[in-house]
């Protein structure tokens, strides 16, 4: 159909979780120790993926890898970093990262009836659509209660409008 699947790496999710621990320690009910552990984990994970990030940056085929602190900074313009339900601010930051790298169509899949992701994902669609009017975002629920035909039709509709 002409589309490409792009998703965050698993390491990005771990980095998000580490940053949440740090935020919780500074602003919510987290302990100093959990905040320190989160900061240490984030730095260690960023250091671990540094060779990968440098190699990808040199590549002509792949987009460069953003540091999670940069993703958080951009996301904080639209959603508070204290939003830690589901994927919280990471989902918004990830969509913005895709948009800034040239994506004009985004499918936000909501798996297994995950209410927190449903709220944070669909809740940000209107805000991001207003900020980026040339981008189309479709939130599609993928769970046993959803119609497979409806899911496929919504995806095909988004793909059909991709080249207009």
Task: Please name every model-derived segment.
Residues 1-164:
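An N-terminal assembly and electron-transfer interface module characteristic of large anaerobic redox
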């Amino acid at each position: 159909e002409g589309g490409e699947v792009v998703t965050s790496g698993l390491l990005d999710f771990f980095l998000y979780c580490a940053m949440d621990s740090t935020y919780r320690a500074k602003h919510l009910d987290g302990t100093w120790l959990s905040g320190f552990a989160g900061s240490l984990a984030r730095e260690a994970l960023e250091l671990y993926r540094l060779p990968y990030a440098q190699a990808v940056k040199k590549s002509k085929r792949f987009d460069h890898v953003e540091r999670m602190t940069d993703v958080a900074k951009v996301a904080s313009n639209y959603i508070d970093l204290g939003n830690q339900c589901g994927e919280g601010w990471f989902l918004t930051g990830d969509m913005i990262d895709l948009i800034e790298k040239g994506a004009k169509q985004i499918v936000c899949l909501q798996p297994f009836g995950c209410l927190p992701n449903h709220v944070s994902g669909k809740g940000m669609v209107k805000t991001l659509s207003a900020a980026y009017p040339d981008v189309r975002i479709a939130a599609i629920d993928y769970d046993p209660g959803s119609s497979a035909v409806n899911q496929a039709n919504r995806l095909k509709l988004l793909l059909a409008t991709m080249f207009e």
